[in-house]
Amino acid sequence: FNKLKQGSSKRTCAKCFRKIMPSVHELDERRRGANRWAAGFRKCVSSICRY
């Protein structure tokens, strides 16, 4: 769980992260705001999307 969260916050775009772990994403969204997520994630490593 922790490993996945770490990897996701580095290398996954917001869309995929939301799909992988909705509850964690919602918590983080409230904590730091959605813009932060959307801004920083250009290259997505997730097999769901591959930006």
UniProtKB/Swiss-Prot annotation:
The alphabetized UniProt keywords are:
Antibiotic, Antimicrobial, Fungicide
Which GO BP terms apply?
Answer: defense response to bacterium; defense response to fungus; killing of cells of another organism
Q: What does this protein do?
A: Antibacterial activity against both Gram-negative and Gram-positive bacteria. Antifungal activity against P.heliothis.
Q: What is the protein name for this chain?
A: Perinerin
Q: What is the source species?
A: Perinereis aibuhitensis
- Source species taxonomy: Eukaryota, Metazoa, Spiralia, Lophotrochozoa, Annelida
